[in-house]
Amino acid sequence: MKLSTASFFARFVCLIPIILVTKPIYAYDELDLQKLLTTRICNDCNLIQANLDSKNLNDVSLLGANLREANLVSANLRGAELIGVDLTGADLTGVDLTGADLTGADLTGVTLSGADLTGATLWMSVLRNSAVRNATFNYSNLKDTDLTGANLIEVELVSATLNNAELEGAKVWYANFENADLGRANLMGTEIYESNLMGSNLKNAKLIGATFYQSNLNGADLTGTTLDEEASTVQGQSNTRLCNTVMPDGEVTNKDCKR
């Protein structure tokens, strides 16, 4: 039976989507990728899912760039300007971000295993539900950073600044916060397991529901905090400063206000 011209055309049109999806699709802009690699300046570029594995990108400028789901495994981004970048879902395993500026960056759901962010600026950045293992944030600025629900395993945060940081519901295992500044940070419901907070500043931090299982808070400042039963393990640790601190029994202690 012969097909009419109209019927043949209708069937051909139906096949067009099938033909189209077989073509390779690149989420990133190839011209933008080439621009980055040649000029090292690619502000507001589209680099979605770009493969930058092991690339030397130190001191590059990527202000406002879109790097969602990009592969940055073992890349060198020392001193990079990454203000406002979108790194949602990116793989940053082993990346070197020493001294990089990630102010306002979105790192939701990233993988940061083995990454080095020593001295990096992450002010007002978002790391919600991120997987951070064996990473280094020593002397970094994480003020006002959102780490809600993040997994921080074996992370180094020595002398890091986390004022007003959001860590609600985060898992903090075997981490080192020695001399870190956690003033006014939200640690409600945070699971802190075998971690070192020696000499840390926790003034006015929100600690309701936080657990400090086998963690070291010697010399920590708990001024203005409320300790419930979950946080009762901090009592009795040496040199912990308790001033205007609400104890698990509801009593307020000011025993260390003068020191």
Task: Show where each model-derived region lies.
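Bacterial N-terminal signal peptides that target proteins for export
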Residues: 2-12
